[in-house]
Each structure stands twice: as C-alpha cells, then as structure tokens.
C-alpha cells in the first residue's frame, strides 16, 4: 500500500505491506474506529484496490472512496461488490476548464461523465465536491458546474488550503463571502450545496 496523496517532499513516506495494513486495521478496531476512507491521489490506480477494500469490509468497517472519476469501471466494480458505502467524487471545474485545472493540455471527459452517470443512477450514497482555487475558479465556472450537475445530489465546495506539500506553488483561496456567492450560484440548479473549510 502506498499513499499517492502526499507530495514527494512529504515526510514519512513509505510503502506498507498488506500484513502491516492488517495490523493497522486491527489496531483501529481496538481504538473504536468504525470506518476508513480509501483516498489518494487517485486510489483506483492501485491494482490491489478491490482486495484492500474487501479486507476492510470483511473486518466490519464502513468504507468511503475518494475518487477523481477517471476509472469508472473500477469504481463500478467496487460498488457492484458492495465494497464501498460512500463515494466522494471530485468535480475539478466546468468541463471547458477541466484540462487547465488538472494541468493538462487535453483531457478526456468521457470517464468523468461515465462516473457521474454511474453514481447518479446507482445504489451507493455519494457526493460531488470541488476544491475551490482562486486562480482556477470563477462565478462563471460555477454557473456551468451548477447547470452540469443539475439535480438533488449533494455538492460541496471545499476551500483550497495552501501548504508546503502542494505541488503547484502560488495558488490561493477565495474569501468566505466569495465561496458563499459561488454556493448560491450553484443552488439555482443543485439545492443541496454546502461549504467546507471556512
């Protein structure tokens, strides 16, 4: 097991064997923990993701999956096997600005659309969420995101937090007032909008 969430300069980075992960799961149960989040980077790039999720579920834990939506088939496999109880999927930006937001010249949106369809038409509880970055997100973007997500889904705006481990330096967060205005824009199409991180 390896955490892809931290930057290369993050402290204490190491890979764990499945035996070490099992010990952690046992210790967590002894501490009264009843749920785990499988996160990353993108955890579905891990070829052992199904096995790890099954181990967690077999030990009686609830499982949340954090995903960017780029692997709809793998996500569907976990859902069909009842290995996840909740999915949080990132919506990086409006479709027109996805490539720019993820740092690519071109980006294939079809896996994102497919993951959204699977969640919206599926049996697992889920949320969509956007980490809001001052340099990347505007009111116009949230007009487009609201129209794109239109429906009763849960949608969260998360304020960006800078740190020494963020790969791209110089990014900033929006003010509380601006985040609230973005939430109001999205609520015209998605009533269930909340803000995190303020």
Per-range role (PLM):
Residues 1-18:
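Canonical Radical SAM [4Fe-4S] cluster-binding loop centered on the CxxxCxxC motif
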